[in-house]
Amino acid sequence: MTSASELRSGKTHRDENFPVASWIIHPRHRDLILAFYNFVRTADDIADHEMLDGDTKLEYLDLLEAELLGRGETQPEAVHLRRALAERGMPPRHALDLLTAFRMDVTKLRYEDWDEVIHYCRYSAMPVGRFMLDVHGESTTTWQASDALCAGLQINNHLQDCGKDYRTLNRVYLPRDVLDAAGAKVEDLGLQKSSPALLKCLQGLAVRTASLLGDGRPLAAEIKDYRLGLEVSVIQAYADRIVRMLQTRDPLSERVHLKPIEFVIASFGAMSSEIVRRSFGKGPVSHPAPRA
């Protein structure tokens, strides 16, 4: 088989909508985090590849898993992550969970309700936060807030990309029961502008996601590592801003994203608040709820 590396989209950690191993994170952690990212990005690109059939995608994902577990040396991203984890004495559990999500991307194109979407997030998003916490030696008591934040980020992304996911991959993460309740049809996702019913569905899901992100807001204060706490505060601020935009905008007719200057302002505002909180030993900074 062709190396999975050759199927990469070309997207790197610098192209993501959120920080990945940014300058905020201590340099001693960056190599491992980037090894994890490159493995995950490779698997994600395979699952989303428009020219591969489903069986071939699953074969590649199985190959990445096998080599991550030590059975082979042909896939650079898997071998690099395996060695990086071994150096730190960490198991591959979070990467394996993410492979479960990518297999779901290949085999499951529709979701019946919110609970099914959250179940998907358990494998597609929550392992990323748990991995970062484990890398920094944080307690598993932080997982609850981390899971909420990561799931909120994932659903934000689902809403932002709902049109593209449907048109290019026939993949729909919007719960079927929510579409039905709003009177919307899956086919509406192929339009250049949301129908009133679809817009109602999307904005209602954004409101629900805002509540989920609220459950993640204590995370920065629960984290002991100073730098990771700052990074999480930035990610939370980014997620809150995006979900506010999704409550009032149409992701089919416009790209819902932060401009670079908006991201910089949000980042430094969040870091400043977190620095103040940590300097004075206070509890979580109270941010406005992410509502329109």
Swiss-Prot record:
Superkingdom classification of source: Bacteria
UniProt cross-references to InterPro entries, sorted A to Z: HSQ_synthase_HpnC, Isoprenoid_synthase_dom_sf, Squ/phyt_synthse, Trans_IPPS_bact-type, Trans_IPPS_HH
UniProt KW keywords: Lyase
Keyword Lyase: yes
Pfam families per UniProt: SQS_PSY
Pathway: Secondary metabolite biosynthesis; hopanoid biosynthesis
Documented EC number(s): 4.2.3.156
Molecular function in Gene Ontology: geranylgeranyl diphosphate synthase activity; lyase activity; squalene synthase [NAD(P)H] activity
Enzyme class, broadest EC rank: lyase
BP GO terms, sorted: terpenoid biosynthetic process
Reactions it catalyzes: presqualene diphosphate + H2O = hydroxysqualene + diphosphate
Record PANTHER family: BIFUNCTIONAL LYCOPENE CYCLASE/PHYTOENE SYNTHASE
Cited NCBIfam families: HpnC
Function according to Swiss-Prot or TrEMBL: Involved in the biosynthesis of the hopanoid precursor squalene (SQ) from farnesyl diphosphate (FPP). Catalyzes the second step, the conversion of presqualene diphosphate (PSPP) to hydroxysqualene (HSQ).
Protein family (similarity comment): Belongs to the phytoene/squalene synthase family. HpnC subfamily.
Protein name (record): Hydroxysqualene synthase
Gene (UniProt): hpnC
